[in-house]
């Protein structure tokens, strides 16, 4: 993944609600893995960010070609009974905007070149009831091969 540290730093330093990179910034290689993480809600502290790599050949058949120049960041929140899901979308939208602003600021300070971004609303609903997770997927595009920027080890 493009430095989990980069995204974690951006979230922990400027986005309210994020304080623990170990429980709130998660990693996955495909949509199925993300949904599996969200199904086990006990292991997820909301709000959370899930970094989805696209450089794993296993996702090629389902989600398109292996890609070393983009990375998805999912910003997710949850709502319970009596709460309005539109509030969760609004809250996670605000978190996503703050994250993007910080990443652009970091890019201007010399971090890997962020070429652009795209986002869309995404939904997840636990199959057998319980809590709901809602949020946004941000697809970050970089001008460099981010697999070469990953720390060794």
Residue ranges, per PLM feature:
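Charged, amphipathic alpha-helical segments and their flanking helix caps
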Residues: 1-32, 37-45, 49-153
């Amino acid at each position: 993944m493009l430095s989990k540290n980069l995204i974690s730093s951006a979230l922990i330093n400027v986005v309210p609600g994020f304080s623990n990179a170990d429980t709130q910034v998660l990693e996955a290689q495909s949509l199925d893995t993300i949904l599996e993480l969200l199904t086990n809600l006990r292991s997820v502290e909301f709000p959370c960010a899930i970094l989805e790599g696209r450089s794993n050949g296993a996702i090629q058949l389902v989600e398109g070609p292996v890609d070393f120049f983009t990375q998805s960041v999912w910003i997710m929140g949850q709502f319970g009974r009596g709460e309005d899901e539109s509030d969760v979308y609004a809250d996670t939208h605000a978190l996503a905007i703050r994250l993007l602003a910080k990443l652009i600021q970091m890019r201007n300070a010399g971090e890997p070149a962020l070429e652009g971004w795209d986002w869309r609303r995404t939904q997840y609903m636990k199959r057998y009831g319980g809590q709901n997770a809602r949020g946004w997927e941000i697809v970050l595009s970089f001008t460099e091969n981010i697999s070469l920027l990953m720390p060794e080890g």
